A protein has these predicted regions:
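C-terminal alpha-helix plus adjacent terminal tail
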Residues: 66-69, 84-227
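Conserved catalytic cores of soluble enzyme domains
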Residues: 1-123
Length: 227
């Protein structure tokens, strides 16, 4: 999977279930489904579940966008290269044999540089660690802000909890708790399918789509409206 640009939702799922996942400096990775009353599906509980637990919760609940270097750090990518090298890599892959793929990727990979997310790891660990429910996580984030943490990142987390669908966040939080039992992507995606059938029958899905994609007022009225 060549992830040179926006890699979100279903696109992220297609990439994460590939044998080789290539990121660039142009990569923007996220699972933003909680903004439309759904939950991170396409097996996200499996691939995000391989990240440290606080990070998996953070990415799944808030839909935060991360860069390619952060994906490398978290094990969400197998290689990093400059965006301008993508066309060269494509040409080589089209002509190569299967057993040559690793060597070809190694020949063009570059240092991803400093992961933007690394700077925020202490805050993520503080808010999203332990046995905390989404409600407790929200309170932790708000407390940091109230204590004078003049950090734009903390503000983003607080805003995400306030704006995104409470039921969606709770569903994914619970889904992560059972992710360890999944042996394959098929198992994770099968459960996602059945959960999605239930979620799209709820008013939150219609409201989320209306708010973000139709009217674009970004003022959804969730049911329930709090965690």
């Amino acid at each position: 999977a060549l992830c040179d640009g926006v890699v979100m939702g279903a696109g992220a799922g297609l990439a994460q279930h590939s044998s080789h996942i290539i990121m660039t400096e142009a990569t923007k990775f996220a699972m933003p489904e909680s903004s439309i009353g759904l939950f991170p599906d396409v097996g996200a509980s499996l691939f995000l579940g391989r990240c440290p637990v606080p990070v998996a919760r953070f990415l799944g609940l808030t839909g935060h966008i991360i860069d390619g270097a952060s994906c490398i750090m978290l094990g969400l990518a197998t290689a990093f290269l400059a965006s301008q090298q993508i066309d060269e890599l494509k040409e080589k892959l089209v002509r190569c044999k299967t057993d040559e793929i690793e060597k070809i990727i190694a020949s063009v990979r570059t240092d991803p540089g400093f992961p933007a997310l690394k700077h925020h790891m202490p805050v993520i660990s503080h808010i999203f660690s332990g046995q905390a429910t989404p409600e407790v996580m929200q309170k932790r984030a708000q407390k940091l802000l109230n204590l004078g943490a003049n950090d734009p990142f903390v503000r983003q987390v607080v805003s995400a909890f306030a704006e995104r669908c409470p039921m969606s966040m709770t569903v994914f939080w619970r889904l992560l708790k059972v992710a360890d039992h999944f042996a394959t992507a098929d198992e994770a995606i099968s459960l996602d399918f059945h959960l999605t059938l239930r979620m799209i029958r709820r008013p939150d899905f219609i409201e989320g789509v209306r708010s973000l994609l139709v009217d674009k007022d970004k003022a959804p009225k969730w049911v329930p409206d709090r965690l």
